[in-house]
Amino acid sequence: MQLKNSIRCSSMIAICLFLSACNEAAVKTEGPHVKEVGFESLAKSDIGVVMEIHVEEARICLRTLMEKLYKRNPRELKKSSFPTAEENVDRLFEQKHDWVFPELDGKIGIDAIRLTFTNDYKGDRVFAFISGLSSMIMASYGYKREFFLFDSAEPQNLYNSARNIEIAVWKLGH
């Protein structure tokens, strides 16, 4: 009898410690940026967390690429209606939007990327390129940045996105 009570008590303590740990903020100083661990993380799978990290890392890389492309191609920034590269970058990565921008004539994804390589396009090619890549990647994840237990990404969409990125990078280099 005393052994059963001891096991119950130990189980309750373990459960309480586990639940209280879920409320503590986990802070990482190195590696991929991951949100703090909270109660909502109980409804996430390992694959969901990996997809979140992947989306966030892609966004960070595209943001950095956009900043570098503006530094190397300042003439493209002059074609924009925004005076600084920071404003253009923030507009794409910090503000809420539906990926449809008037200067791209409503084109998103691969259609926006194609504008970059069109000779008669007079707009900001850096914005068209990065906006197209970003919207294509986000579309392959269902335009979500947070994934829970039953969420999934379509493998064919991820594959198509990866192939399109390879083609776009090749075209940019040639």
Language model features with spans:
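Bacterial N-terminal signal peptides that target proteins for export
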Residues: 2-11
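C-terminal motif of bacterial Sec signal peptides marking the signal peptidase cleavage site
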Residues: 18-21
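N-terminal Sec/ER secretory leader and immediately downstream segment
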Residues: 23-125
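Mature extracytoplasmic/lumenal regions of exported proteins
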Residues: 109-174
